[in-house]
Amino acid sequence: MKIATCCLGKKTKKFFVCILISIAIACGFLVFNAARLKSRQIDVQAIVQSDIDQTVALSHLSNAVQIPTVSYTNRVKNDGSVFLEFQELLETSYPSVTAHLKRYTGEDFGDAQNPSLLYEWSADRSEEIPAILLMAHYDVVAIEQTSLEEWQHPPFSGAIENGFLWGRGTLDNKGAVIALMEACERLVKAGFKPRRDIYVSLGHDEEVGGKYGNQQIASWMRSKGIRLDMALDEGGGIYRGVPGLAQPAALVGIAEKGYVNITMRVQLNQTETGHASIPPRETAIGILSSAVTQLQQTPFPTRLDGGVSRMLDYLGPEMSFFNRIAIGNKQIFGSIIENQFSSTPAGNAALRTTLVPTMIESGFAENALPSTAAANLHLRIQPGETVESALRFLRSTIQDDRITLHIDQTLDGKPRDQLGYREPSRISSDTSASFEGLHRTIKQVFPNVAVAPFFVVASTDSAHYDDPTLTKNVYRFTPWNLDQTGVTLIHGVNEKIATTQFIQMIRFYEQLIINLAGNT
């Protein structure tokens, strides 16, 4: 009996030793993978802060904000005089740019009603180097009239108070327009000669899709045989408060989601309708409501292999040790990472194609059962997926022949005035010379940030240049530094920009032009 007990004890001891060895090996594997995460941040010296006449620069932005360049989907509603006034403001505010850069207008693009602008800064060398395109837009979204009393300063005041410049467009996107023009003006005055052609595009209808602005400019560029190494538009930025990261994150968009508006319609026979006092088991509204609920309860699958994975490859090495263990072992902890991201609206949008019902229409009387009901579904589609794959997912989820899906109809069954969808963009390189130039510039001007690529969830005018025959790489980044409160000001009440941030934006564009087009 003692022998048996002794043998059993030895076996138990050996078993636990094996368990401990296995745990040690597993821990070593996790730690090894975490240790393999090497920083991808470029080590550069911060630039010497150049002298900028802040009073003049801020007055230019204030004047720009005071011009209410609101764009509408139906461009007949646009006030052409304010767009012309804005163009004249640029011409008088930046005399060196006006004198030395060639300016193209709507007439050059074949549409005299197009108030978008394109500046060409010709290279000082004869060698063929692909050009770069720097983009911003000067149209803004309308002000909700019921919100006017909530504004601390009138939305088109351009007021400067307590370190902020207030007004619609300060963040989206007149701040970038004026910062870009200030940078060009300073460089022209200093005698800077670019070694490659530089184009500056200032759109007038980005907020409504860019159909008459940058879409026409991009077509004109193709017709002229212009080739772009890089296009840079809005989309990313510098954000504070990224979970697990002690420093701000400078997120550069290397792709953007597509979108589609889908009309989901239920059409019943007249025999299935009638008086509300004798309702059938199912109604058009009930069927539609059930389908909407089913879609919301069955979200598109998450994809960690997309923009989130690339972002973590850059940010992971800058995080704490335990975060590095999770990120360095994504094949093991992928589901945990996905759950953490999808717990917030922004993180959820980064991980998957999203769907949200935005409009619903049915009924014609309080006591009558309608034969039809329709809802608009707005989808933002992940790069790597398509509009067609999204439609297949919806059909497989609903599985109801009484429900039809249309991308070419509005809720009332009429044809859409404009294209109801845009496919996701290509994924641009995060190892190209142009991305490296962006990365380097960000670190020179904002030395305490961690740079990372990501996928933009919104749509930008850069989509019109997302054509490999025209543009090699498309990036999306605006050099503002925002926390979550600042992000909510975009298109919101009390939109404003810190005056110090605006001055840093000028320095960023100036240094970017030097890095990408300076003589080396």
Model-derived features with residue positions:
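Acidic/His- and Gly-rich active-site-bordering loop/insert found
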Residues: 25-168, 189-195, 377
